[in-house]
Every structure is written in structure tokens, then in C-alpha cells.
């Protein structure tokens, strides 16, 4: 079951002056690489909405930069206090975007960039929040599998679960009206230029 965004939470974000950009797509498609470059090049105008998660940090990940790493109890407390715009559970781990993360960016005149999964996208779409939705797609499901296996960060079961989830996300992206822009990441430079143009547009 997909958690629902409460009206009290949504009302706090309806008045955003800068339209957030929601970037979604299968795990391993290259979102992190493109977004890190985007924020490095345009950190004065754009800001990454750092999500909360209960999962264990991967090698090289830093708390407060890649994610806010919290315990399950801490995460559940934030859910109960309606601190999240959206939240979801995947592979036993919880992920969420806090209201404060977006508000802090708005306060310094930066457009919020959200990297969330399909569950989160559906929650934000069901709210009054006016956002722009960008789907980042792999050249093929086969190439996505190669990328996932090449990372070497997960076991076979986790990889198969991510591939199953990727198929559902791609199926969702193929339906008219479910996104504002589709970018196929078959050429990193080309994909970056497309994403850059979208995020910098008014």
C-alpha cells in the first residue's frame, strides 16, 4: 500500500515559489551521477533535497550529503509527526523526503531537486504540490542489469528485485501524461544537457 500525503503536510508546500523538479527512474540508470554534476555546475540555483533513509550507508556515502541516515524508530517518529512530503519502503528499508528539506532550499532561493521512487512520485502527484516530473530511462532493461551487476553492492536477490521494480517504472513511464519529460540515458553528455535545460527552466 502506498502511504498517502496528508492535507496538512501538503498545505505547507502549496505556496512554493520555485517549482520542484522530481527526477525518477530505475535504480542504476545514472540519476546520482547526473544530479551530482548538475548541482556542482548550478549549486547557486538548484539544491538537492536530501532524503532520510533507514538503510546502511554504502562506501563513500556521507550523512547529511547523500542521505540523512536514521534508525527505523527515528524514521517512524518523523512519519507520525507528518514531517515527510513522501515516504516509501523498499527491500525492508524506509526512504522519505522531508518538508524541511524543500523549505530550506526555497528559503535560499534554490529550486528543489527530488530523487525519489515511483511510490514517492505517486504521493507527490496526488498532492496540491506543483512539480515538474522527469523520467530517466535506461537504453534497455538488459543494459540496466549490466549496470546493476557492475556496481557490486547487492546480492542476486536484491538485483532481481530492482529489475522487477524497474520494469514497473518503465511501464508507468510509457503511459501518456505520467511525466513532463523523458530522458534516455544512452549518452551521458546528451542526457545531462537535457536534464540541465529542464531544471534551469522557469
From Swiss-Prot:
Pfam families (alphabetical): Guanylate_kin
Documented EC number(s): 2.7.4.8
Ranges that cross the membrane: none
Binding sites annotated in the UniProt record for ATP: 25-32
Domain Guanylate kinase-like intervals: 18-200
A GO molecular function held by the record: ATP binding
PANTHER family: GUANYLATE KINASE, GUANYLATE KINASE-RELATED
NCBIfam families assigned to the protein according to its UniProt record, in alphabetical order: guanyl_kin
The family this protein is said to belong to: Belongs to the guanylate kinase family.
Functional description taken from the UniProt entry: Essential for recycling GMP and indirectly, cGMP.
Protein name per Swiss-Prot or TrEMBL: Guanylate kinase
Amino acid at each position: 500500500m502506498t502511504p498517502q500525503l496528508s492535507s496538512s503536510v501538503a498545505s505547507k508546500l502549496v505556496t512554493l515559489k520555485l517549482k520542484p523538479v522530481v527526477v525518477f527512474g530505475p535504480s542504476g540508470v545514472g540519476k546520482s551521477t547526473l544530479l551530482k554534476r548538475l548541482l556542482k555546475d548550478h549549486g547557486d540555483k538548484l539544491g538537492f533535497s536530501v532524503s532520510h533513509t533507514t538503510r546502511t550507508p554504502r562506501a563513500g556515502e556521507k550523512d547529511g550529503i547523500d542521505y540523512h541516515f536514521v534508525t527505523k524508530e527515528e524514521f517512524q517518529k518523523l512519519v507520525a509527526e507528518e514531517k515527510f512530503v513522501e515516504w516509501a519502503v523498499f527491500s525492508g528499508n524506509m526512504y522519505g523526503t522531508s518538508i524541511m528539506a524543500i523549505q530550506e532550499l526555497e528559503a535560499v532561493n534554490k529550486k528543489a531537486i527530488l530523487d525519489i521512487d515511483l511510490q514517492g512520485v505517486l504521493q507527490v502527484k496526488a498532492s496540491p504540490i506543483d512539480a515538474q516530473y522527469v523520467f530517466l530511462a535506461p537504453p534497455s532493461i538488459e543494459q540496466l542489469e549490466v549496470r546493476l551487476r557492475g556496481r557490486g553492492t547487492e546480492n542476486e536477490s536484491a538485483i532481481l528485485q530492482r529489475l522487477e521494480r524497474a520494469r514497473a517504472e518503465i511501464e508507468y513511464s510509457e503511459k501518456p501524461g505520467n511525466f513532463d519529460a523523458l530522458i534516455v540515458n544512452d549518452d551521458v553528455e546528451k542526457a545531462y544537457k537535457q536534464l540541465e535545460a529542464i531544471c534551469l527552466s522557469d
